């Protein structure tokens, strides 16, 4: 810290002991309930190359939300099959490259569904595709959602039937659906948010009789904050709800922490 105060430029000051403790806690908490659970570090939280390389060394995947972040992950040594590609800002070229090379790609729009038809047919059969689910979080957690009663900005709405149409599109074009992505932004980061996410995942799996490889519950957790839910609290709750559905007994989980694994360990 003393050396940091001597610098004549803004900088990040990283307490590696705190960051390591938070990362290890996240890993152990996920693996307690899903031995092969996937943890993707959210690049948008802080994409400082040292931090990304550190997360890679710890075994965390890259969670990216733009073509620039996708390219950064590759430049920093991530193999394409250890990247999770989310969000509506995917470029077409990077999207197709990701789909054809084993990246977990969570489809966010009808435009991306159409892009799938331009992918190599044989490679598409081996792809790992999820659908971003948009549901009314406010109905489950009044006063806790960022959007209130308005529709979220991302993904396919369950309530309007857009999700059903996306599922039908995949079935009609013989595109295998590997997963669902249900990240929700909230005001509270409460356990109720993840209870809702898990319950909606179960509801969709039952309604459409889906056999999925993964459910991506996103990020937004507290981390290293006293008197707030721990990683174990979140993941145990989700696991208990998933355990009520036989169709999910062989389904893996993806979590995407960002601030929860670095926030307490970084100063400026």
Language-model segment annotations:
Residues 10, 101-107, 147-158, 186-192:
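Flexible, glycine/proline-enriched loop segments at strand-loop-helix junctions
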Residues 131-158, 167:
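Phosphate/diphosphate-binding glycine-rich loops and adjacent basic-rich segments that engage nucleotide
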Residues 151-171, 187, 193-201:
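Metal-dependent enolase-superfamily TIM-barrel catalytic cores that perform enediolate-based chemistry
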Residues 52, 75, 95-97, 116-119, ...:
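Short acidic, glycine/serine/threonine-rich loops at helix termini
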Residues 45-47, 68-69, 89-91, 109-111, ...:
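Active-site-proximal loop/turn and secondary-structure-junction residues that shape catalytic pockets
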Residues 1-127, 164, 168, 172-176, ...:
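A charged N-terminal "starter" segment
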Residues 186-268:
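C-terminal active-site-proximal or functional interface alpha/beta core segments in diverse enzymes
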Residues 42, 128-134, 181-183, 216-218:
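Short beta-strand segments
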């Amino acid at each position: 810290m003393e050396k940091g105060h001597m610098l004549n430029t803004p900088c990040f000051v990283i307490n590696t002991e705190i960051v390591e403790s938070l990362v290890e806690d996240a890993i152990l908490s996920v693996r307690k309930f899903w031995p092969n659970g996937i943890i993707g570090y959210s690049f948008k939280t802080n994409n400082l190359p040292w931090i990304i390389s550190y997360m890679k060394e710890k075994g965390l995947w890259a969670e990216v939300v733009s073509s620039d972040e996708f390219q950064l992950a590759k430049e920093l040594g991530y193999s394409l099959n250890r990247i999770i590609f989310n969000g509506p800002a995917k470029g077409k070229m990077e999207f197709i490259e990701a789909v054809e090379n084993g990246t977990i790609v969570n489809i966010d729009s009808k435009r991306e569904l159409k892009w799938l038809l331009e992918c190599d047919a044989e490679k598409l059969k081996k792809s790992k595709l999820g659908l971003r689910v948009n549901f009314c979080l406010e109905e489950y957690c009044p006063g806790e959602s960022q959007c209130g009663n308005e529709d979220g900005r991302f993904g396919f709405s369950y309530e309007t039937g857009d999700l059903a149409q996306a599922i039908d599109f995949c079935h009609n074009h013989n595109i295998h659906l590997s997963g669902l992505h249900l990240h929700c932004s909230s005001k509270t980061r409460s356990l109720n948010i993840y209870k809702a996410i898990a319950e909606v995942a179960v509801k969709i799996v039952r309604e459409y009789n889906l056999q999925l490889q993964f459910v991506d519950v996103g990020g937004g957790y507290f981390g290293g904050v006293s008197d707030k839910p721990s990683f174990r609290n979140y993941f145990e709750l989700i696991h208990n709800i998933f355990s009520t559905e036989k169709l999910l007994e062989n389904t893996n989980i993806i979590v995407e922490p960002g601030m929860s694994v670095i926030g307490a360990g970084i100063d400026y």
